[in-house]
Amino acid sequence: MSRSLKKGPYINVKLEKKVLAMNESGKKVVVKTWSRASMISPDFVGHTVAVHNGNKFIPVYVTENMVGHKLGEFAPTRTFRGHAGNKKK
């Protein structure tokens, strides 16, 4: 289910403050966050956000196509080892 439009997007307050401060100062620093549920806003474009996947931080460079998606979509939590198949001898 998607979030109600009258509520607006969820963005972690501390994460948003850090990105806005970087926009004002012009610095490009990797920001670590555990907030996978935060929506990517247009202010995030051009910055790198390190998103926690439960084990380590995955660096995510934000582009214009990512606006409106959530940060957790770009940091997979499970490793795909492949399907069971015929083992070649």
UniProtKB/Swiss-Prot annotation:
Stated name of the protein: Small ribosomal subunit protein uS19
Presence of keyword Ribosomal protein: yes
Gene Ontology MF terms in the entry: rRNA binding; structural constituent of ribosome
Family: Belongs to the universal ribosomal protein uS19 family.
Annotated PROSITE patterns: RIBOSOMAL_S19
HAMAP family: Ribosomal_uS19
Cellular component GO terms, alphabetical: cytoplasm; small ribosomal subunit
Function: Protein S19 forms a complex with S13 that binds strongly to the 16S ribosomal RNA.
Species per Swiss-Prot/TrEMBL record: Bacteroides fragilis (strain ATCC 25285 / DSM 2151 / CCUG 4856 / JCM 11019 / LMG 10263 / NCTC 9343 / Onslow / VPI 2553 / EN-2)
One GO BP annotation of this record: ribosomal small subunit assembly
Top-level taxon of the source organism: Bacteria
Keywords recorded for this protein, A-Z: Ribonucleoprotein, Ribosomal protein, RNA-binding, rRNA-binding
Gene this protein is translated from: rpsS
Pfam family, one: Ribosomal_S19
UniProt entry tagged with the keyword Coiled coil: no
